């Protein structure tokens, strides 16, 4: 006899998403995490497309959604700007702490509990050992609890830093992205929040050794309209490595950032964490871990691989060429709010309208992804 049907290690988005499925299936489960409070520290900007909200049946209650998105701006340091406008919501920005706390309601969670080791069906923690038929590892990008995870290379990690600043809502469009010399391998973002607050953040590839705090400060000096009183900050690592083909090892399932389920082209992790967590939770509820492996390979892995290939092109292209993208996109016309369609369409447009970008895509071995 086992203590639990399933033990979930990690009470972030992926672990909580798996927990919700198990809870609704009436399974005997527990979620273990070393932190003191759900939703803290914040590990996400909270942005996600309408497509994935619908696909994953994510809640959009006003209490947990900071903003709804209908227009997006993409620009560079030279002032080149492309704006995509829609007559319907195409995305949301969650209040991330409230979102995770909403997911956690009613779940069997034990905080202040660090998992030290996992061996077969036994989980060793700082509060003693427990056993489970199945185990879901949702303990983040630097987890040491599975042999699947190698030490991530610096080129496969983005360092994200964000400041929530006192600023009025934008009058031109809802959210903005800058491809900037201040953000090598990444970008700068401006997301709306509640109560005259906006989230100004930056992601830089770790290999660049760029200090994201200093880089965001330098960027702000170039864009003084973004200056505002800082209410709070977040910083976190974002894994953008090649997705693993195998995520199930016997009775152990790997989800979320621990499985590199981040959309590497944008650094967006909320959709991959939710998707992988739900798939693993469903498999665990049916006591069939291999079901998760099959659905990972057929559903999630191909999407993650496409985004990784886009990221690979960006990392092949010199930064000064990346800065040309907003200019090239001036002739791009978005058709849907589905980012599974629009991001590859956008990348194809860039490749077809720039001979040098085509060359870099060929060098990266990624042109087949867009034809």
Residue ranges and their predicted role:
Residues 1-14:
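Beta1/beta-strand and adjacent pyrophosphate-binding region of the FAD-binding site
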Residues 11, 105-227, 244, 260-262:
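Predominantly flavin-linked oxidoreductase catalytic cores and closely associated redox partners
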Residues 14, 37, 142:
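Conserved Rossmann-like nucleotide-cofactor binding loop
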Residues 23-43:
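Glycine-rich FAD pyrophosphate-binding loop
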Residues 48, 52-101:
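A conserved beta-strand/loop capping segment in the N-terminal third of enzymes
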Residues 208-286, 290-291:
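FAD/FMN-dependent oxidoreductases across multiple families
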Residues 282-320:
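Active-site-proximal substrate-binding core of FAD-dependent oxidoreductases
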Residues 320-371:
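C-terminal auxiliary extensions adjacent to catalytic cores
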């Amino acid at each position: 006899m086992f203590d639990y049907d399933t033990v979930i290690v990690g009470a972030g988005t992926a672990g909580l998403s798996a927990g919700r499925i198990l809870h609704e299936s009436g399974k005997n489960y527990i979620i273990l995490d070393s932190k003191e409070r759900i939703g803290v520290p914040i590990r996400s900007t909270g942005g996600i497309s309408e497509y994935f909200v619908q696909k994953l049946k994510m809640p959009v209650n006003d209490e947990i959604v900071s903003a709804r998105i209908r227009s997006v701006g993409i620009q560079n340091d030279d002032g080149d700007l492309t704006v995509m406008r829609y007559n319907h919501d195409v995305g949301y920005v969650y209040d991330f702490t409230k979102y995770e706390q909403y997911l956690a309601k009613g779940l069997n969670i034990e905080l202040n509990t660090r998992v030290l080791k996992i061996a077969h069906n036994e989980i060793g923690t700082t509060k003693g050992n427990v056993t489970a038929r199945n185990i879901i590892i949702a303990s983040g990008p630097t987890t040491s609890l599975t042999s699947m995870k190698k030490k991530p290379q610096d080129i496969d990690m983005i360092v994200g830093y964000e400041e929530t600043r006192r600023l009025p809502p934008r009058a031109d469009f809802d959210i903005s992205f800058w491809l900037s010399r201040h953000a090598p391998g990444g970008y700068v973002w401006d997301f709306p929040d509640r109560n005259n607050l906006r989230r100004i953040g930056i992601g830089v590839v770790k290999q660049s050794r760029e200090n994201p705090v200093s880089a965001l400060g330098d960027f702000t000096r170039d864009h003084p309209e973004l200056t505002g009183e800082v209410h709070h900050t977040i910083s976190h690592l974002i894994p953008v490595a090649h997705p693993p083909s195998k995520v199930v090892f016997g009775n152990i399932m790997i989800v979320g950032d621990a499985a590199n389920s981040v959309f590497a082209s944008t650094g967006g992790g909320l959709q991959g964490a939710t998707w992988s967590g739900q798939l693993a939770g469903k498999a665990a509820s049916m006591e069939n871990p291999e079901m998760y492996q099959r659905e990972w390979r057929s559903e999630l892995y191909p999407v993650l691989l496409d985004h990784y290939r886009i990221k690979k092109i960006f990392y092949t292209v010199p930064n000064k060429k990346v800065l040309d993208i907003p200019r090239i996109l001036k002739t791009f016309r978005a058709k849907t709010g589905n980012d599974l369609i629009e991001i590859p369409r956008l990348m194809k447009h860039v490749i077809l309208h720039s001979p040098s970008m085509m060359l870099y895509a060929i060098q990266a071995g990624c042109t087949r992804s867009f034809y």
